[in-house]
Amino acid sequence: TKPYFEGPRQYVKQPPAEDCPVFNRHNHCPALVNCPNGDLLAIWYTCRTEPGRELGIVASRLPYGEDQWQVASDFWDAPDRNDHASALWVDEKGTLYHFNGLSAAATWGSLATIMRTSKDNGTTWSQARLIMSEHGLHHMPIESVLRTREGAILVPCDAVPGSAGGSVVLVSRDNGQTWTDPAEGQPIPDFSAGSTGASIAGIHAGFVQLADGRLMAFGRGNNIDGRMPMSVSDNLGETWTYSGSPFPPIGGNQRL
């Protein structure tokens, strides 16, 4: 085999206004999934201003075997609500999951989280439902959903609307039927080396399950000793222990 180099390929392609009225000037916060049929599906929010009620979600697809992304189209847009922000995940049986924040009105401070599923590579979707009944903090999904070896689905969400204050994990142990938030009602931790708390250090967290079963997460903000913060949990996100990572911190316009 030979090395293959290509790109970058633009996936944000502006559609005609009559085909996609929600499309606007500011496009941000993508989620990406490899569909069972080999297609790549990307979604992101589009808006005039990030706090605006006009903010909605659009999608583009790179069909398997093709080298160009399709023009953007409507994906999710609750009328007169700020839809901030999105995550995609595919399970072991090929079912796609879409998680999204749903504001009570404008801004991303007070959100509920919706979930819907697709069994045909994202062509059609189930009716959306709230996975937890109340609006509030801890409901802006981050694009690093995973299923643990124990079978739990974990959806990370920003814990705060600001640039520092951590991330939390919504947990389902029954394949998405019911959900809990281990950090609900808990104070924002002291994100210093050696401390523990109910949240991940840093917003927009990315995380994995290690070979020994622990969860390891990195975040943006809440830097520790001048480094990107690292959080480790040995109880599926119930509590986290903090330390500085080997990596330099990241800031605005950067994500894990």
Regions found by a protein language model. Give the residues of each.
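Asp-box/BNR beta-propeller blade signature and adjacent active/binding-site loops
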Residues: 1-256
